[in-house]
Amino acid sequence: MGCCQDKDFEMSDEQSKEEESEDGREDETTDTQRGPRECERGLPEGRGELRGLVVPSGAEDIDLNSPDHPNHKSNESLLITVLWRRLSTFGRRGSSRPSKRQPDQIRKQESPIREGNQEEPEKG
């Protein structure tokens, strides 16, 4: 079972050696170049999956690579977009760029001064 062995599935060393010899996988050069899940699904080298990042409750046993889920790529791109926007807004909080709140604060500080100036001419 080489690199394709599931992390949750435990086998002894003897069992795994027997399975490898039965499968005819004595030459593992291609398996060592890929990640542990890539050789299992036949993904091209260098391609990974965004699996396990967000799992809705009750959806643990659903295979997202099956043809029943045609919107998988659009869901991934939506997830990436949402996370990117959150990250970018989070990063702006500590930046030195002026935010939209500063002009409002300046107006509030100036308004009592203007009101005070308007009251003086009325008195005199």
Swiss-Prot record:
It comes from the Eukaryota. Residues 11-30 have a biased composition (Acidic residues). Residues 1-77, 90-124 are annotated as: Disordered. Residues 1-10, 34-50, 101-124 have a biased composition (Basic and acidic residues). Expressed in Testis. This is Testis-expressed protein 54. The gene is TEX54.
